[in-house]
């Protein structure tokens, strides 16, 4: 529950920024939010591994899907905000969008599932963010 609340807070705080600040801080805010979530997950790594690997039938079984839905909604809000700044209209097939966002979260949680040492997980998470940021910039016309 707490990681979901943390994620929602990061999204909400970002949406409170002015449109110009959102554009300028997109990557840094995403990176710091991912780092906070990573730190939180590693503080309770064994619990998170159980949630990620053995939560079928519990209230946690859809954790990643819930995060994906929140991220997709936040992406739409961000795209609309960017349109007001003069950026092109955001057009993406909803299935592809869902696949891309699901891929991000699945990849993010792989460090827990595969017991990646924390220092490596930090590096991988930063590279994951860089990779996805570049792709989203291309898709969004930045």
Model regions and ranges:
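Solvent-exposed, amphipathic alpha-helical segments
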Residues: 2-13, 47, 103-114
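Short, hydrophobic secondary-structure boundary micro-motifs
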Residues: 49-51
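Hydrophobic alpha-helical connector segments
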Residues: 2-43
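Hydrophobic/aromatic-rich alpha-helical bundle segments in the mid-to-C-terminal region
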Residues: 78-131, 140
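Hydrophobic core segments within long, regular secondary-structure runs in both alpha-
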Residues: 65-68, 72, 125-133
């Amino acid at each position: 529950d707490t990681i979901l609340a943390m994620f929602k807070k990061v999204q909400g705080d970002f949406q409170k920024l002015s449109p110009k600040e959102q554009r300028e801080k997109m990557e840094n805010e995403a990176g710091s939010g991912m780092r906070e979530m990573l730190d939180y997950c590693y503080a309770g790594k064994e619990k998170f591994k159980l949630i990620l690997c053995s939560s079928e039938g519990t209230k946690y079984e859809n954790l990643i899907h819930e995060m994906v839905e929140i991220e997709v909604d936040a992406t739409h809000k961000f795209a609309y905000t960017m349109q007001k700044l003069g950026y092109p209209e955001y057009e993406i097939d909803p299935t592809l969008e869902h696949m891309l966002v699901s891929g991000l979260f699945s990849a993010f949680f792989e460090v827990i599932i595969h017991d990646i040492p924390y220092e490596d997980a930090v590096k991988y998470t930063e590279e994951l963010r860089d990779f996805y940021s570049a792709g989203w910039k291309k898709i969004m016309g930045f």
